[in-house]
Amino acid sequence: MHVTRDFSHYVRTAGEGIKHIDLAVEGVHCAGCMAKIERGLSAIPDVTLARVNLTDRRVALEWKAGTLDPGRFIDRLEELGYKAYPFETESAEVAEVAESRFLLRCLGVAAFATMNVMMLSIPVWSGNVSDMLPEQRDFFHWLSALIALPAAAYAGQPFFRSAWRALSAKTTNMDVPISIGVILALGMSVVETIHHAEHAYFDAAIMLLTFLLVGRFLDQNMRRRTRAVAGNLAALKAETAAKFVGPDEISQVPVAAISPGDIVLLRPGERCAVDGTVIEGRSEIDQSLITGETLYVTAEQGTPVYAGSMNISGTLRVRVSAASEATLLAEIARLLDNALQARSRYMRLADRASRLYAPVVHATALITILGWVIAGASWHDAIVTGVAVLIITCPCALGLAIPTVQTVASGAMFKSGVLLNSGDAIERLAEADHVIFDKTGTLTLPDLEVMNAADIPADIFELAGRLALSSHHPVAAAVAQAAGARSPIVGAVEEAGQGVRADVDGAEIRLGRPSFCGAEALVGDGTRLDPEASIVAFSKGAEKFILWVRQGLRPDAQAVIAALKARNIGIEILSGDREPAVKAAAHALAIPEWRAGVTPADKIARIEELKRRGARVLMVGDGMNDAPSLAAAHVSMSPISAAHLSQATADLVFLGRPLAPVAAAIDSARKALHLMRQNLWLAIGYNVLAVPVAISGVVTPLIAAAAMSGSSILVMLNSLRARSDSREIV
């Protein structure tokens, strides 16, 4: 019977002519596995990306559209000795919980056997220095074998299965030397017992398995902790929504069945499943994890809502603008996934070292055995020493040194409101010693404020707001928002470059340029009140009013600038805005170095000048308007609105009103880089010390297992320090 495989549900478009799929891969435990999988998949023609994420054992694949069947990737992984299937968050979590429980059972069996075998070994050890009869010693050895052999057969399954799959595929992984070491120790012990020898190694073999299982169990649980942020984000995703299928009829349908333009009902206590705009109702919503706004947002007609937001109080009708994988939540999840799977410079270095290290280890173990035999040692002693070399030199710590830090640091940055858009952004940001800020939309809030709204009569301001709804100009949008306008004036006409007008109760009303409204005489007053203001006029018959609109500084901008100065970071403003506006912002923030009226070319020239002086420049600017200067800087960062997240071009982006993510990201990056270097030195130092000691024969396989597991756990624990909070911004 011919069986076909359809993976179309799991394949998505990653770019023009490029397809993407995520596969879950079983049996990935170390950097050697990662390197082998990536090499094997990259060798397939037309594959443009093959990247393994060790924290969730997922491989991301991209290839030229129309050239490959995704089933070929699964077949190739099977040839390499790994079982693979399309990645789904829920099923991956279930599989990981099942594996964690299995590891715990194996650990329990191994630990129980270890305690009993150790108790049986005590009489043997004491008998070797007293007068124990050979028959008594053999009896204790056979009892130990009766406990250790079945226990090892069960508890060693995680290693034996992985090694068998690798050998069946005519390859090796780091479970192969571990399995060889355990089997050799048990086999030698049985042979020694049969020949009535004084020494057997059942205690060492089963304790070796116990140490290895402790290390693997802790390693898996630490990986789950590092992925906690991504898991929390996935938990925000609602799978169904109440869709209106008639004027007063709703149906609970999967999110995949919802399209833009549909209307859904959002009840109190529910998570929003779509992006859209409220068309009816009033409520408070919590969207802190989506947009960075820590306070509840009042949602009413015209308010945008996003998938993952929690509806707190009222009932809302929402017109859908995006659903499923097109939502802001999905875009944030993709950016976070990219950050977790990214390859930094240090990670590429560690991968290369791990890949070269494995064959060297195997060769070293073989040479050690032969060297000891040539030197006159027995095969027994030589093999024991070789087993110790195989185990102690496993490059697990080296393989975990960088990805664990990057995963933890990415999660810490996400909690600070920062998303990574580049693989080596953390390392480059940590090196930054000079920050250039754009003013408009960066140091200032992206939304405009009507500064003199309180001075305008309420009825006039409401009328101006309703008229502003008929204009597409951002200043008009600010007036409409400030006035709380919801119903536009019927019959309003917009005149390009001038403003908008309409007739109300027989009187003509106008909103726009002062000349359009006949209010030129009032402009001087507004300019004197605030030289930075954008001027908009409103007229109703003979009544004339001036509204002055400006962008306010971000609420914490002054504190953030002070914090950056305290970190010995140079700061300046480069803005294309008018000199009075830039000068006022620089004065308010105590930034002595600023330039106004600069062009994109001027910004690039200034960045290049600083780079020639040896500065590492962080450019913080609008992701769309400052694209050239963002690309020219050593590293770049953009404040970006929810609507424009998918268009982000900077190395890092942040959502929300505060500027604090800039300082928090620098702190996190510097700490992460410090921990990466620390971990590399820990891993390298461990191997430099461990290999000669193991070759010398001083270390038993038992001590080797404890040292190898301990080095990996030490690296993981050190990496978790990247979660700690950044320095307080005051």
Swiss-Prot record:
<feature type="binding site">
    <location>
        <position position="626"/>
    </location>
    <ligand>
        <name>Mg(2+)</name>
    </ligand>
</feature>
<keyword id="KW-0597">Phosphoprotein</keyword>
<feature type="topological domain" description="Extracellular">
    <location>
        <begin position="697"/>
        <end position="701"/>
    </location>
</feature>
<dbReference type="GO" id="GO:0005886">
    <property type="term" value="C:plasma membrane"/>
</dbReference>
<keyword id="KW-1133">Transmembrane helix</keyword>
<dbReference type="GO" id="GO:0016887">
    <property type="term" value="F:ATP hydrolysis activity"/>
</dbReference>
<feature type="topological domain" description="Cytoplasmic">
    <location>
        <begin position="163"/>
        <end position="168"/>
    </location>
</feature>
<feature type="topological domain" description="Cytoplasmic">
    <location>
        <begin position="1"/>
        <end position="101"/>
    </location>
</feature>
<dbReference type="Pfam" id="PF00702">
    <property type="entry name" value="Hydrolase"/>
</dbReference>
<dbReference type="InterPro" id="IPR006121">
    <property type="entry name" value="HMA_dom"/>
</dbReference>
<keyword id="KW-0460">Magnesium</keyword>
<dbReference type="InterPro" id="IPR023214">
    <property type="entry name" value="HAD_sf"/>
</dbReference>
<dbReference type="GO" id="GO:0009399">
    <property type="term" value="P:nitrogen fixation"/>
</dbReference>
<dbReference type="InterPro" id="IPR023298">
    <property type="entry name" value="ATPase_P-typ_TM_dom_sf"/>
</dbReference>
<feature type="binding site">
    <location>
        <position position="30"/>
    </location>
    <ligand>
        <name>a metal cation</name>
    </ligand>
</feature>
<feature type="transmembrane region" description="Helical">
    <location>
        <begin position="677"/>
        <end position="696"/>
    </location>
</feature>
<feature type="domain" description="HMA">
    <location>
        <begin position="19"/>
        <end position="85"/>
    </location>
</feature>
<feature type="topological domain" description="Extracellular">
    <location>
        <begin position="376"/>
        <end position="382"/>
    </location>
</feature>
<feature type="active site" description="4-aspartylphosphate intermediate">
    <location>
        <position position="438"/>
    </location>
</feature>
<dbReference type="GO" id="GO:0005524">
    <property type="term" value="F:ATP binding"/>
</dbReference>
<dbReference type="InterPro" id="IPR001757">
    <property type="entry name" value="P_typ_ATPase"/>
</dbReference>
<keyword id="KW-0479">Metal-binding</keyword>
<dbReference type="GO" id="GO:0010273">
    <property type="term" value="P:detoxification of copper ion"/>
</dbReference>
<feature type="topological domain" description="Cytoplasmic">
    <location>
        <begin position="401"/>
        <end position="676"/>
    </location>
</feature>
<feature type="transmembrane region" description="Helical">
    <location>
        <begin position="203"/>
        <end position="223"/>
    </location>
</feature>
<feature type="topological domain" description="Extracellular">
    <location>
        <begin position="124"/>
        <end position="138"/>
    </location>
</feature>
<feature type="transmembrane region" description="Helical">
    <location>
        <begin position="169"/>
        <end position="190"/>
    </location>
</feature>
<feature type="topological domain" description="Extracellular">
    <location>
        <begin position="191"/>
        <end position="202"/>
    </location>
</feature>
<dbReference type="InterPro" id="IPR027256">
    <property type="entry name" value="P-typ_ATPase_IB"/>
</dbReference>
<comment type="function">
    <text>FixI is a pump of a specific cation involved in symbiotic nitrogen fixation. The four proteins FixG, FixH, FixI, and FixS may participate in a membrane-bound complex coupling the FixI cation pump with a redox process catalyzed by FixG.</text>
</comment>
<keyword id="KW-0472">Membrane</keyword>
<feature type="binding site">
    <location>
        <position position="622"/>
    </location>
    <ligand>
        <name>Mg(2+)</name>
    </ligand>
</feature>
<dbReference type="InterPro" id="IPR036412">
    <property type="entry name" value="HAD-like_sf"/>
</dbReference>
<dbReference type="GO" id="GO:0055085">
    <property type="term" value="P:transmembrane transport"/>
</dbReference>
<dbReference type="GO" id="GO:0005507">
    <property type="term" value="F:copper ion binding"/>
</dbReference>
<keyword id="KW-1278">Translocase</keyword>
<feature type="transmembrane region" description="Helical">
    <location>
        <begin position="353"/>
        <end position="375"/>
    </location>
</feature>
<keyword id="KW-1003">Cell membrane</keyword>
<feature type="transmembrane region" description="Helical">
    <location>
        <begin position="102"/>
        <end position="123"/>
    </location>
</feature>
<feature type="topological domain" description="Cytoplasmic">
    <location>
        <begin position="721"/>
        <end position="730"/>
    </location>
</feature>
<keyword id="KW-0812">Transmembrane</keyword>
<dbReference type="Pfam" id="PF00122">
    <property type="entry name" value="E1-E2_ATPase"/>
</dbReference>
